[in-house]
């Protein structure tokens, strides 16, 4: 009986250890691992990101949306108005996206997938971050507390930023973009 308890305690201890992986740029490591997380999502993706201009990541987000994954995106309003930003494209594709209006800057860079994994770090979701910048990202899984902390932070940020203000912001941006043509 004691032997069985020892074996079971080793099994549960082993499976409860947090796992992490660190990636650095310039290289495709951060981009590829974010895309892999998005592609493996089954239920929910929550993204808080300063800037998103990377076409490959944008396509992975849209693909997850098409698979029926619930997606919420919070991004910086100044960065979202950048001509190469993908925020308007994602908004037009029907994704639930808010521009950050509560604090001066939305400078987070994290994604929570299915309440099981987090990717965070300095990595902006841009081609420059992938190919030119010195950036990092950290993938965390099998760590319920850390993932829960990130999920709670996302929930707070989501609640304090108005969907109505975000919708109005995207509508005004569309009008400004049309006027420039």
Q: What kind of region is each of these model predictions?
A:
Residues 36-95:
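Primarily the HKD phosphodiesterase
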Residues 39, 90-91, 104-105, 111-114, ...:
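Extracellular/periplasmic catalytic domains that process cell-envelope and extracellular macromolecules
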Residues 5-13:
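Bacterial N-terminal signal peptides
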Residues 19-29:
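Boundary/entry segment of secreted carbohydrate-active catalytic domains
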Residues 46-48, 72-75, 98-99, 111-112, ...:
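Structural recognition of the beta-strand scaffold that forms the well-ordered cores
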Residues 14-18:
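Sec/Tat signal peptide C-region and signal peptidase I cleavage site
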Residues 117-181:
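Signature of lipid phosphatidyltransferase scaffolds
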Residues 51-55, 77-81, 103-105, 117-118, ...:
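Solvent-exposed loop/turn segments at secondary-structure junctions
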